[in-house]
Amino acid sequence: IKSSPWRGSQFLALKRLTRHRLHLAECITREKTYMISNLFLKFSELEILDQESQPFSNIFGTTSAAVLTEFFSVQDIVDASEEELLQFLAKKSRNRITNLAETSKLLKKAAQDSYRLDKRAAEPLTIALASSFNCIESYKKEIKAIDHAIEKTVKGVNPNAYMILRSIPGIG
């Protein structure tokens, strides 16, 4: 009779890690949903633009975050000179935006078409957006740490199973 050691505690650890990862992923989704409501209040037109008219490929990206948190209001974007906005976008995107002039034009157009808020509402919304960006980044870092722990645990249970799982499209 050939028997293998009982690995119930390892499976329990894996179960807890995967459930915690799901919890963190749900937290990111919830935070992004909450952030979208604040984004609509601060920069209404940016949220409702179709994909071709969007100045940013990812509304939750670094350049978008910089625009949303470093410009006090949409009026500041409208009032910014073309050169100033181009330099800002180039610096914050680390020159990764291929067509800065087009992005700047789309951003200014969206800012011009957005609703104007009372100045007293602009600062709390900017703070809330900055906080949401920080929370999302923090959750992403935690998910990376959990992924590493899951990988380590799965390799401890069965190293071959991990490689098999990674080879399946949609899972790995």
Give a label for each model feature:
Residues 1-171:
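A detector of single, family-specific signature residues
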